[in-house]
Regions:
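Short, small-residue-biased leader/transition segments that mark boundaries at the very start
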Residues: 1-13
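Short sequence/structural elements of tandem HEAT/ARM alpha-solenoid repeats
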Residues: 11-14, 30-36, 81
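Intrinsically disordered, low-complexity N-terminal regions enriched in serine/proline/glycine
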Residues: 3-5, 31, 78, 126
Length: 190
C-alpha cells in the first residue's frame, strides 16, 4: 500500500525520538553514552576499542540539541521535560578552574570543560591510553592517547539559551518557528 511507504519516514522519526528519550540515564547521571547496551536499562556500552562504557559529555550535549529539534517539529513538551536534568549532569562533571589549569586546558566564554567519558555510577573521569598492543582506560590523566581527546568543551550556555527561548515562545511564535524548522529541514534534505 503506497500510504505505508509515505508514513515510513514519519514512523522511523517517531521511533528515533522515542529511543533518544529512553536512552537518557536517570538522575544524577541524566546523560547519554556513545553506545548503549540492549539490556533492561539501556546502560552505556563500549563503542570503539578506546571508547569505554560510560556517559559522554558530547553525546549528552548533542542529544539535548536533538530533543529541542524534536520539540520544534512536534510541539510535544515531553522532549523538553528532562533537558534540565541533562544540564545538571553536565554541570556536575565539569572541570573546575584548578582542574583545567592542571590539565593545561581553557575554554571560551559560555563553555564548560568536561571529561569525554565518565564512569557509570561515580561520574569519575575516564582517561584513554594505549601502547602498541592495546587500549585501556583508567583515572590517570597522564600519558593520554593523542588521536582522541579525553576532554571536551561544551557550549552549555548556548544550549541553556536555546532551551529558555523555546520555553518563552508564545503559541503563535512557536507555530511560526515550527513551520520554519520544517521548511529548513526539507530544503537541507534536497
Amino acid at each position: 500500500d503506497h500510504r505505508d511507504l509515505h508514513s515510513f519516514p514519519t514512523r522511523r522519526s517517531s521511533d528515533l525520538m522515542t529511543c533518544v528519550l529512553a536512552l537518557q540515564g536517570g538522575k544524577p547521571q541524566a546523560g547519554w553514552a556513545m553506545q548503549h547496551k540492549l539490556d533492561l536499562n539501556y546502560s552505556p556500552g563500549h563503542a570503539r576499542d578506546f571508547e569505554p562504557a560510560g556517559y559522554a559529555a558530547t553525546a549528552t550535549a548533542e542529544m539535548c540539541r536533538n530533543l529541542m529539534r524534536f520539540y520544534r517539529w512536534t510541539g510535544d513538551t515531553k522532549y523538553l521535560a528532562r533537558i534540565p536534568d541533562a544540564f545538571e549532569f553536565l554541570e556536575s562533571i565539569r572541570y573546575n578552574d584548578a582542574q583545567m589549569k592542571q590539565l593545561g586546558k581553557s575554554v571560551k566564554p559560555g563553555q564548560i570543560l568536561c571529561p569525554t567519558f565518565v564512569e557509570v555510577g561515580t561520574n569519575r573521569p575516564l582517561y584513554l591510553h594505549n601502547d602498541p598492543d592495546h587500549y585501556w582506560v583508567d583515572y590517570d590523566y597522564h600519558g593520554l592517547i593523542t588521536h582522541y581527546s579525553s576532554t571536551r568543551a561544551i557550549d552549555l550556555q548556548s544550549l541553556k539559551d536555546e532551551y529558555q527561548h523555546l520555553l518563552s515562545l508564545s503559541k503563535e511564535d512557536f507555530s511560526a518557528e515550527t513551520a520554519l524548522a520544517i521548511a529548513q529541514a526539507a530544503s537541507s534534505a534536497l
